[in-house]
């Protein structure tokens, strides 16, 4: 396992860009164990200290979008 670190200014920007309750759309998620198709929508729950954007997805999943790996876009 590896530890991820994120610069404070990047974390601040993520939290500003993806506040709790905003709606996002999945562009791409790199998770070989889950079916997470592009276009799926969800509501942001919070951004954690590592920059993971935790989302309640429309398929019932609560996977976090990982900054720098997965791609989401805000749609509201």
Regions picked out by a protein language model, each given a short descriptive name:
Residues 2-76:
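Basic/aromatic-rich interaction segments and small domains that mediate binding to polyanionic partners
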């Amino acid at each position: 396992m590896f530890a991820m670190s994120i610069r404070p200014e990047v974390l601040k920007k993520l939290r500003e860009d993806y506040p709790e309750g905003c709606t996002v759309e999945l562009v791409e998620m790199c998770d070989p164990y889950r079916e997470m198709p592009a276009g799926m929508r969800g509501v942001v729950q919070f951004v954690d200290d590592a920059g993971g954007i935790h989302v309640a997805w429309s398929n019932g999943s609560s996977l976090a979008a990982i900054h720098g790996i997965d791609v989401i876009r805000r749609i509201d």
